[in-house]
Amino acid sequence: MALKDKQKWDEKYKNNPAPDKPVKLITDFAKLSSGTKALDVACGMGRHSKYLASIGFDVDALDISYVAIDSLQGIPHIYPKKVDFDTYTFPIDHYDLIICTYFLKRELFPKITEALKEGGIFIYETFLYHPDNENAPSNRSFLLEEGELELTFDHKYEIMHLSEYWDEDQQGAKTMKAAMVAKKKSGGMGDEDFGA
């Protein structure tokens, strides 16, 4: 990611209060993991890392923002690290649970899958394109397309939960979102499975 991205997120985290309540998808499904080694991709200020640590996970919390990562230093069972996702190398077959919310970088899908142990759980939630969205990123490449999660993951994951739904924020703005909980099957996926 460019220096511009890092600066943008540093400013956002300095000047805007971050949500502190974990999304329901994570509180509902994280406990399905059979192990306790977790990865929080693009963790932001760490609401999900903190939740996972509170229920017994050891969490690698990754983000491009120094502000975000510094806020997580010293919290038991959270191991924050500032990374550039354009160049970061994920460990192979390392995590029992990987979560990612409101960050879409399709090139990471095969890397995330390789980092997940066989039988590991991937929990993902982000914005979905819809022409009537009132509060979503304006850059279409930052939005999933309808049916994209199922098309991308169905052939090598056991999809345990999949939904595309309208959500309303605190100001009443409506936005389409997509959510998935999937269990990595034996054999996993490689770059070729993602069209890379």
Please report, for each region that a protein language model flagged, where it lies by residue.
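Conserved SAM/SAH-binding beta-strand->alpha-helix loop
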Residues: 65-67
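A short acidic, Gly/Pro-enriched loop at the edge of an enzyme's catalytic core
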Residues: 90-97
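Conserved SAM-binding strand-loop segment of SAM-dependent methyltransferases
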Residues: 75-87
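Conserved SAM-binding motif I beta-strand of class I
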Residues: 58-63
